[in-house]
């Protein structure tokens, strides 16, 4: 079976460059051409609220994706609920809950949600940007959700693909990721390849790693790389139109992947792009590598891997 996946589109006209209707159409047309059974994103799809875009435009963008003639699915990222209440986002995204699963052509896709802060022993979901107040407490997966994942994997009679915004593989990923990895290893000992692949977005990086017999795919942003220290080399007139342009390295194309699953063989067909005006992170006052030692690239790599 084959599906299309992208991440971190960051639709916010006038704030970010990229994440446009044209980008969405590009992803859709490639999915149609490749025969993808569905399209899914790994979070940070759209920024709502008046500070980003009028409600009607924000909702229209979401509905454009929802109403494609290929099934579409959402996964929550940290920014999806920055300016729109969680309950409203779930309604607009047509999600049954913050976590859910579906089966497609012999595989189970499990969308889980580590968008929680752990504060005084309580797991508090991200909502209206609350996590900005407690950054050290973010990126936790509640134990109840780990148990839900265990049950959903145990009940599957097929390989499972796990998708979330934050990472189970990166050292700067989900805080209690080892508990989840231990659970995955337990399930794979009981039933080989119970969990075949784990996909995350969020970090705007491109990396593939096999960890304990599971393929972990750190999926790049479809739109840009974020830089903390602004770059002052963009044209002034563009910066006046796109507020956070100086804080981004823009990709010229909506990079994403089409993934084919055949038994335990995973084929990732990525794509290469380039950066707007040829501007790279090395031209700015920002470190070239991130906390996991990964460079920014305007690319989603391609690979064919059989897990044994």
Where do the protein language model's features map onto the residues?
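Active-site glycine-centered loops adjacent to acidic/histidine catalytic or metal-binding residues
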Residues: 8, 43-44, 77-78, 165, ...
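Extended active-site neighborhood of metal-dependent phosphoesterases/phosphodiesterases
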Residues: 51-151, 179-195, 209-246, 255-260
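Short acidic, glycine-rich surface-loop motifs adjacent to enzyme active sites
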Residues: 41, 45-46, 151-171
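Histidine-centered catalytic micro-motifs
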Residues: 162-167, 198-206
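N-terminal active-site segment of His-dependent metallophosphoesterases
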Residues: 1-55
